[in-house]
């Protein structure tokens, strides 16, 4: 405190002189350059999590914080990582006050504030942007963009996420539209789910009307989020189905679903298309590509590069080789192949420990999906946003029809897609008598819009099938016959229009 008071440019001169007097009285007052150098080193270590403290061993830490509103110190219980970043924020603030003219001092001060604020708010809630802007001395959107870039470079995921949340409120098209990918788009490629969503959400809020580098990633991540089923899963790759079955049985009680593949190609496709997969298990039985090549491919892909991977070794010789291969590699562990429930549960627990410090909850998955569906609907009907080519993600969007909360939006999206697959899917939905009639009527509306936009894309056989469905519905409720008759009227009206 005396050091800050004696060196801070914000301290009134009499107080600075008094603090310097007491420092000299107690011993030699350090030079400003010495203080800056030491603080700089400590801030960087705290920020990057390289400075271990006694509190690191505790689950909760008591810290005293000054509340500007109440004008008094308040006791808070926080997690050790939050306490470490709080300490970094305090030190960085001192560093900045000592020499506010240093660009690096300001950058570390603001980065540490972002890192701390995000760890304090948690993954599911946005930081208090006004609080950050108040501390940031008229920061510009361009400077926030620079902070995002530096946070990505330093792997400060929380700070990067917070920077995206700030850009959502203060950013503009200049932070997105470019012939080179801007940091907001690059943030999607880092591979952290919460950071990906924060970047997407900011871009969706800014809503540029001009094509830009990396726009395809934005549309893809939106369709990926939207296809979530809100249940975390692990993916198991092995040529024997009983291995996947054993993992499915053992992981269920721990809240995990399970999917499997018996080839490297299918495993990669599954891992990069299912947004609910969070842990990967790869057996050395998979070939073409080999287990190690598959790992390299997954580490290179923006959806899977940060996922924990467990390598399953078939015997002791392969286990030893795999342990040597994974030594010192982040989020990569080796296990002996086992069908035992307890052994699998233990392996899963170790992989969970390799996950991001903030997990993705079912509520998070739903929130990400809902925001993405909202944006996809608006992008699909806005001709200014045609450059996103929403139709190229049609396969992932078809299933949204069967999710009650998203049926209406999915129908409107599919209505803009002049494809046989979209029309066939809508007719299949309308024809299912066990679905709510209100939802079927919504999709019938969308089918009519689709035909008006691009004509009928169905084959003669598919149209005949629809007549058969109508004829078979004579014993079903009247509203079912009505909605089935309506889509036939739409088809016939189009036919008659073409004959004229």
Where are these regions (language model features)?
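Short hydrophobic/Thr-rich beta-strand motif most characteristic of the beta2 strand and flanking loop
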Residues: 255-263
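Conserved acidic segment of CheY-like receiver
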Residues: 230-252, 280
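Short coil turns that connect the paired helices of HEAT/ARM alpha-solenoid repeats
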Residues: 5-14, 135, 150-158, 186-194, ...
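Amphipathic alpha-helical scaffolding segments comprising HEAT/armadillo-like alpha-solenoid repeats
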Residues: 1-7, 31-40, 141-151, 174-187, ...
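Structural detector for internal amphipathic alpha-helices that build alpha-solenoid repeat scaffolds
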Residues: 1, 14-26, 131-136, 158-175, ...
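Conserved phosphotransfer microenvironments
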Residues: 279-306, 312-321
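Acidic, metal-coordinating helix/loop segments flanking the phosphotransfer/catalytic sites
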Residues: 262-279
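Short coil/linker segments at helix-helix boundaries
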Residues: 34, 41-91, 115-142, 178, ...
